[in-house]
């Protein structure tokens, strides 16, 4: 006889967290914010050419179905009735671009990932077209014209992929970020799937006006993007549609936030001036600026932080983005073989406790905030014969911390009020060496929740609080207090300053590596195109001349 189901856990809310490296599904108790069960599936990335990064949208979708099914099985093993799951929220890697056929449900091309650099020429061409106001794009979107954002990725597909061109001509194509692809598929796909996104994801496309909270025709005309490709834009917390298949059939999807905005909500940074830093594939520092857009003068982005209800106001954030954080650990493991598992880097760094003067700038995809320098490339400098893999491991962790400090300093200048502590989350925060390094380099306390899944928690909170679900209260007095671990600085401020100044020198050396100019302005191709006869005759003349000069008979 089956064990009786537990009824005391109260209403539950699920959260899909779709990231660059993995997909997870997590289930929380809406009354206590307790994480009850979860499942994770690792994802592959494809690198067809240098600087290109793609993922298979169907693999991503299948990973979501698998995570939901396995988590529900685990809940069943815990005697928890999955009918208690009242809503599902979605959190996703932002900017990553998908275009698919609405009649077949098939992707028309691989998802072009946020890290992808193929659109550099597209960006250069577009920058020449910008009207007289050089801030035309940024004033509407809060974003610089960059390879990072979705509009240029979509423009590249429209220019280069025949399948996409044909589907657009025939009115079959739909565009979206990962959230749009997942929600459309989960709510029925070709059989009535809801084509939508939320304000936080829309604000990362470079097609969305962050003041009017609508798609901007002038921007769409500038990028030559047909507006009928675009999803409907909703708030971050409302019922979008019902799941149409699987263990959670009939459960509403009622929350949607880009991953970094979800983490801001999950860290409960609802007050102006509160900030969090998420350490994942990249590093993302967001500071809540309230109901006003603050435009940075120091290389940061202005973005929509959240809009928790159809009739609720939008809140904004300043954001600094680091392209390579956790990705550097993957690179050390997969490309160099310095470590076998991600956990090895903490052990190696702890062995030496210093980089011994070695500095690592992991600008594999150029530099993001505050430089926005696509010509930069990764460098290791300060190496000696004494340098070993432990020092390089330490330098890799230190690089993440230095990049965070650069963003924090820019944010302090823009906001005018220095942060007194930094709230952190993300997979890398399990690395205690990294967290202590971060406190040392910032010289302020770093505060980490014991429950690190704040991105999932934010998506669950938005879903549970939606009108028509209402199982999660976002009133300040009702919010669950997360238990925190605190890391205090353990070095003198002068030492921190010296190390940071040396890092800045290394950053300067990383810039300008990628250039369309040949060395010395010459054309090296001429040296590979000499006629064979000329080469032989000239070589004989030089040989005879050399023998004559040396006095050889």
UniProtKB/Swiss-Prot annotation:
Positions that bind ATP: 24, 281, 326, 427-431
Pathway: Polyol metabolism; glycerol degradation via glycerol kinase pathway; sn-glycerol 3-phosphate from glycerol: step 1/1
Binding site for substrate: 20, 94, 148, 259
Coarse class of the protein's main subcellular location: mitochondrion
GO CC list: extracellular exosome; mitochondrial outer membrane; mitochondrion; sperm midpiece; sperm mitochondrial sheath
Membrane disposition: Single-pass type IV membrane protein
Reactions the enzyme catalyzes: glycerol + ATP = sn-glycerol 3-phosphate + ADP + H(+)
GO molecular function: ATP binding; glycerol kinase activity
Gene Ontology biological process terms, A to Z: flagellated sperm motility; glycerol catabolic process; glycerol metabolic process; glycerol-3-phosphate biosynthetic process; sperm mitochondrial sheath assembly; spermatogenesis; triglyceride metabolic process
UniProt subcellular location: Mitochondrion outer membrane; Cytoplasm
Keyword field: ATP-binding, Cytoplasm, Differentiation, Glycerol metabolism, Kinase, Membrane, Mitochondrion, Mitochondrion outer membrane, Nucleotide-binding, Spermatogenesis, Transferase, Transmembrane, Transmembrane helix
Subunit structure: Interacts with ARMC12. Interacts with PLD6.
Function: Key enzyme in the regulation of glycerol uptake and metabolism. Essential for male fertility and sperm mitochondrial sheath formation. Required for proper arrangement of crescent-like mitochondria to form the mitochondrial sheath during spermatogenesis. Can induce mitochondrial clustering through interactions with PLD6 and up-regulation of phosphatidic acid synthesis in the mitochondria.
Family, similarity comment: Belongs to the FGGY kinase family.
Protein name per UniProt: Glycerol kinase 2
């Amino acid at each position: 006889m089956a064990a009786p189901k537990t009824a005391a856990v109260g209403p539950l809310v699920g959260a899909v967290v779709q990231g660059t490296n993995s997909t997870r599904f997590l289930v929380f108790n809406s009354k206590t914010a307790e994480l009850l069960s979860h499942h994770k599936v690792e994802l592959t990335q494809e690198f067809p050419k240098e600087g290109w990064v793609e993922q298979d949208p169907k693999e991503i979708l299948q990973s979501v179905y698998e995570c939901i099914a396995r988590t529900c099985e685990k809940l069943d093993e815990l005697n928890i009735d999955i009918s208690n799951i009242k809503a599902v929220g979605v959190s996703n890697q932002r900017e990553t671009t998908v275009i698919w056929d609405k009649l077949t449900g098939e992707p028309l091309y691989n998802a072009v990932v946020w890290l992808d650099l193929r659109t550099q020429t597209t960006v250069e061409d577009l920058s020449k077209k910008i009207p007289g106001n050089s801030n035309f794009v940024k004033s509407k979107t809060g974003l610089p014209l960059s390879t990072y954002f979705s509009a240029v990725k979509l423009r590249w597909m429209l220019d280069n992929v025949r399948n996409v061109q044909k589907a657009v001509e025939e009115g079959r194509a739909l565009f979206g970020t990962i959230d749009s692809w997942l929600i459309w598929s989960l709510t029925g796909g070709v059989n009535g799937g809801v084509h939508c996104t939320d304000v936080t994801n829309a604000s990362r496309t470079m097609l969305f006006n962050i003041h009017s909270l609508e798609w901007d025709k002038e921007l769409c005309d500038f990028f030559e993007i047909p507006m009928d490709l675009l999803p409907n834009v909703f708030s971050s917390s409302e019922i979008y549609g019902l799941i149409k298949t699987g263990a959670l059939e009939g459960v509403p999807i009622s929350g949607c936030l880009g991953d970094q905005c979800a983490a801001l909500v999950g860290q409960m940074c609802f007050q102006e001036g509160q900030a969090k830093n998420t350490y994942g594939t990249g590093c993302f520092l967001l500071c809540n600026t309230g109901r006003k857009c603050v435009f940075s003068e120091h290389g940061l982005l202005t973005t929509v932080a959240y809009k928790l209800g159809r009739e609720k106001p939008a809140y904004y954030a300043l954001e600094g983005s680091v392209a390579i954080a956790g990705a550097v650990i993957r690179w050390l493991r997969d490309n160099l073989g310095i470590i076998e598992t991600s956990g090895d880097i903490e052990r190696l760094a702890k062995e030496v406790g210093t980089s011994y003067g070695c500095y690592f700038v992991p600008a594999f995809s150029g530099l993001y905030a505050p430089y926005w320098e696509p010509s930069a490339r990764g460098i290791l400098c300060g190496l000696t014969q004494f340098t070993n893999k432990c020092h390089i491991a330490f330098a890799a962790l230190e690089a993440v911390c230095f990049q965070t400090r650069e963003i924090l300093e820019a944010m302090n200048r823009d906001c005018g009020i220095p942060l007194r502590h930094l709230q952190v989350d993300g997979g890398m925060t399990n690395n205690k060496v990294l967290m202590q390094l971060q406190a040392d380099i910032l010289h302020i306390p770093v505060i980490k929740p014991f429950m690190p899944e704040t991105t999932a928690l934010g998506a669950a909170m938005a879903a549970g609080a939606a009108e028509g679900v209402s199982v999660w209260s976002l009133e300040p007095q009702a919010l669950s207090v997360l238990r925190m671990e605190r890391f205090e600085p353990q070095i003198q401020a002068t030492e921190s300053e010296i190390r940071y100044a040396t890092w800045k020198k290394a950053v300067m050396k990383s810039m300008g590596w990628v250039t369309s100019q040949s060395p010395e302005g010459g054309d090296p191709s001429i040296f590979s195109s000499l006629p064979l006869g000329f080469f032989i005759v000239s070589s004989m003349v030089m040989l005879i001349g050399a023998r004559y000069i040396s006095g050889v008979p």
